[in-house]
Structures are given as structure tokens and as C-alpha cells.
């Protein structure tokens, strides 16, 4: 229900519009975009109009006076106010905390989906996510780095696990890199199983991005896959490819030092998989070792997994 206050009198606006013209004779609207369930109010002098954002996060307020209105959205402890000059126009009232870690994942998802990321959210910022009863630190590793697979533009943020997932996995049980990233067990079996354990809101919001990887078996041919959860390639972690072919992307801004490439499992430094097939053999994939250096190993070896994703 919306409440309209005109000249100090409150009028309910329910299932149909009630128009109360003032001396200016105008009827105007503000369409406020915010979070679902947020309380939205517009105030000008002694006149206030209020409403609640629908499930899509839109609250349309009907006003009866032009001019400058103060529009406020409130949801829990979050409040944001913007001043708008009313004819009919939209106002963005996306609610978020300036400190990335202080936002819940639903808010982070909503901000990413809006396409407008606050400047205070920086590469290297992190937030905890609970997956299958275990808490993991999730880092921002890039901004506007990955392309959406549907061609609709760039993902505002790319996220990756700060350390390794609690279970070690083989890259390919057949001990081959033939078929590359596209056909390996990690991509077709293990990562989908992990994704099914992530928070429901996160699962629903993760979008496919385009990842480039060689097809394996010593071939320099690069193919593009559409991935929700993915592993990083060698060039996305290091300054240049040493054991993989050119063309598998570019380095994420996060990976500026060997220390940042070192990941842990239960407090111990752990080697972790890359998606890059080793260019000189038909039976190895690339890895990052426990000291943060590049390397390669048989794909039926169980190593750490630090997957990435975008909203």
C-alpha cells in the first residue's frame, strides 16, 4: 500500500490510482530502482509520498506537484537519499555499503547486475562465502575483465577463492590433456558438483563468461568455452605463458606477486590447478606450486581447486 500525504492529510492509495490535483494541475511519477522490499519515500515541503519496492526492486511513486523532491530508500540498516527534479524520471537508489566486505551476497549480486560498481570496491577486497558448511574467503581479482558469453558486455567483477576448496581433485582421470579444458573432468564433473553446493542466490546469479584455452595434445589451437565456474589459465595468473600456448587471456590485476599466487589448504601451502594444458606433452596440465611458481603435472594427480566466477 502507498500512503499519500497532501496538505497534512493522509490518503491511502491501494488497488487503483487516486488522483488529487493541486493548483498546478499536474500528475507526475518517480520510478525508483532499489532493492526488493525497500521502503521508498519522496518528500517536498510538507508533502510525502511513500511506497514499497516490488520483487524487481522498482517502486513507482505518483506525485501531484512538480519541482525538487527528496527521494529516500530504506532497507534494514541501509539508507540512501537522492534529490530529483520531478517531471517523470527514473532515479537509481541501489543500496550498498561502501566497504565491500560489509555487504551480503544478495547486495553484491544486485550491484553487479546493475552494471554500476562503486569505486570503493577494489581488486583485492574479499568477502566470506559459506559453501557446504565451510567458510571461504572470496576475492575480487578483476574489474571489467571477463566478457559475458552471450555477448551482452563485460562482467563488472570477477571473483576467485582466496585459498583452495576443502577437497582435492584430479583434472582428468584418464591422465591426458587431449580435449583440453573443454572436455576435462574438472570442467564437466567436479566444478558443477561444487556449484550445486553454493548458496542458492549465488548459484542463480552466476553468469557464463567466455574463456579461451588451447585444445590440448600439444595443439596451439585456441577454443572458447562458456563457463560459470572456471579455473584460471597460466597467463591469467603470471606475466606471460611459460608452459602453455599464447591466447588464453590476460593477467588479472590481482596477481601482482608470488605471495598472492600462493594458496593454502588447512593452513598448509597447496599446489593448485590451472585450466591450461601443458604445451609440450599430451598428458599434463599446468599448475601453480606451493611456493607460487608455475609448473605442470599429470592430470590424474589430486591438487587444490581455486575456482573463479562472475555475476
Residue ranges of model-derived segments:
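Short beta-strand/loop motifs in extracellular/secreted proteins, especially
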Residues: 2, 36-40, 67-69
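Extracellular/surface recognition and adhesion modules
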Residues: 32, 57, 71-73, 140
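Short Pro-Gly-centered beta-turn/loop motif in secreted/extracellular proteins
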Residues: 59-70, 76
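Collagenous Gly-X-Y triple-helix signature in extracellular proteins
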Residues: 92-311
